[in-house]
Amino acid sequence: MPTEPPTDGNTYIIDPESGTEMARLMNQDRLITHGMGGIFPERDDISSMHDILDIACGPGGWVLDVAYAYQKIQVVGIDISRTMVKYAQAQAGSQGLDNATFRVMDALKPLDFSDGSFDLVNTRYIVTFMPKTAWSGLIGECLRVTRPGGTIRLTEAEMPITTS
């Protein structure tokens, strides 16, 4: 159910704390991963990846998938929603995924990580909450926390433009 428009610059119109939204995000995550051809469809060799950040991880589906499939990779998920992070932490704990961690963090603000912390920075479908004016700041933060030679992967839906 839609809530009052946010006043913090966030444009997400659905209550991110609702169980229904959490379930929708988990289903969406599975569909995106499957539709893309897997967790890392663009890579044949991930041996150089040791640390991964997932920005706006929601209930943690992609982080949990990576942590389960690649137990030597440390995966960190961040999200602004404490409810989502608590759920993701509980899932990681119940699955024994010590290589998956989750933190409450606002992607619209400077990220609380050291420079060059990650081999891959991933984010998907953040256009739902990102104001146009915040993109350059987020890209700058992604560049800052990505190691030299690392990858920034932004996945968004193509918005159809039509006059019919």
Model segments located where?
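A short acidic, Gly/Pro-enriched loop at the edge of an enzyme's catalytic core
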Residues: 111-120
